[in-house]
Amino acid sequence: MIVSASRRSDIPAFYSAWFMEHLRRGEIVVKNPFRPAQEKRVSLKKQDVDAFVFWTRDPRPLMKHLNEIERSGYPYYFLITVTGYPRLLEPSTPRIEEAAIFFEELAGRIGRRRLIWRYDPVIFTAGIAFDFHVNNFSNLAQLLSPFASRVIVSFFDPYPKVERRLLKAGIAVEKAAGSREQQTDLLARFAAVAARSGLEIQSCAEAALTAGVRLGGYARPPVGLGGCARPPVGPGKCVDEELLNELFGLNLAYRKDPSQRKLCLCQQSVDIGSYGNCRHGCLYCYAR
């Protein structure tokens, strides 16, 4: 079993003490996010956990516990989101300069192969256009590529509640700017930056990039999309059993996570977070 901590909330940033308490107990009770009255017990005992995948904006509160996690024998890697957007969109996330520092420290402790940078979501607004993303991504790649092995990019999904929240703040999403053609062009620029920076680049659950891809297993990018021989960025897995096998000598077989979106290629995992308790305050977040 892979434990995801967590798509729903930033456990490393805000609930690392809570996580460690339950890790020591060897068990956690997780509520169904859609039916809170339904609960299930999830074992966190070493013999039941193949690995942890930590999702975060700020790993620093958990970093002081990494020695204990490693002594207990748990494999893990980090997915760390850094977008560098204006504070109106993400008022309480770490500054870019802070992110570069903790990336460097964490890479020095566990190696860059266990650090994955997420540039997610790619959003278009009146003040955040194509050229902003090209320059922003390039600057972030220059800062973070010495300390990360891979970057995962994903475009903004216009959930109604999120669009309402953005509009209330006076921010209109530029949907035309986020067209499939624009996405493909932008990803080509991202791919060139990633190649120069020594970063592997993947997309996350993007219909424009995974049409024709076999979803029952990890596949190569499709051919003939958007007038290109193949898209500039292929589909990837945030929860990646192949990476875990490579890093830790595991023997995990691929099984698509049935609880995720159709186009998501992630390995099946158990998420131990809950919605509505992240304190970063990002206006575009679907988990608020």
Whereabouts are the PLM-identified features?
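Conserved Radical SAM active-site core
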Residues: 1-89, 96, 100-112
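Active-site beta-loop-alpha junctions enriched in small/polar residues
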Residues: 8-10, 57, 81-85, 120-122, ...
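Flexible glycine/acidic-rich beta-alpha junction loops that bind and position SAM and/or redox cofactors
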Residues: 90, 123-127, 150-175, 205-217, ...
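Conserved C-terminal portion of the radical SAM core fold
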Residues: 98-164, 189-205
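A structural motif corresponding to the C-terminal lobe/cap of the Radical SAM core domain
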Residues: 170-186
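A C-terminal junction/extension of Radical SAM enzymes
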Residues: 181-257, 262
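Local cysteine-cluster metal-coordination motifs and their immediate loop/turn environment
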Residues: 262, 270-288
